[in-house]
């Protein structure tokens, strides 16, 4: 890709207590034509000389106290959205400790221009990686797949690409620590924003001793964010079953049982999950595919309820079966990737 094109791409580097190699990383990125935004996340004063080496080559953001990677990323997105709209069309976030190869950063920059969605650089986690990194990665990958129905081999990677038009959306996503990056993926999944993966090198220098990731504290924070999403899902499912049971208990005609219960299920899943759990932002326009898949799930589940009704079978059991089918369909739609199409 030519330098002129990369000049329209910003590399956002959140930095806390940088390594002496940091200026070399900045120089290499600059030589490739990137716009560089550095956010000093409250580093200790003794690291100021390292920042002094790069200040004339970058847009530099700083504040007094360490507030976390998520906060630093959002400050960077805010700065780009407010000041660089004419200069930047796309943004690549990368770690400042050398974990991301410069060539991989450039490859993400190329791909995000083709997809115009989110690009996630994914490491090969089957390789030998430090234990404290594997703990968070494996747990996050498993829980994310169970809850969203989408398998991402590496959802903890900090190497990502975004269209600059998403800066306001990115600033509104909750989280100031490491959980922020996972919240971005969960919210993108719920709102139908496509996520494309690209293989990148797995680099852990000095057994990842320079990382500021705290295995227990940060893993709990990250998984808590995921589980909150799962709890909301469970609430909607429980509400659906309770609605069916109450209607059946009061002997309301079965026509109302399956129509009302299906309304609760599908509308709840497509409205409550998205508005209640993520209703903190100026929302993006949701894909038409999102509504089409909702209608398909509604029709299939309603047919199941009709079958149980006409056969005289226990209607609450039919509700469980319909719920199971809806969950499976949601999983299949998520794995197919069609939810991200506009």
Language-model regions, residue ranges each:
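Acceptor/aglycone-binding surface of glycosyltransferases and processive sugar-polymer synthases
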Residues: 65, 71-79, 102-178, 205-213, ...
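Short beta-strand-to-loop acidic/aromatic patch adjacent to the donor-nucleotide binding site
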Residues: 85-99
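Conserved donor nucleotide-binding strand/loop of the catalytic core
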Residues: 52-86
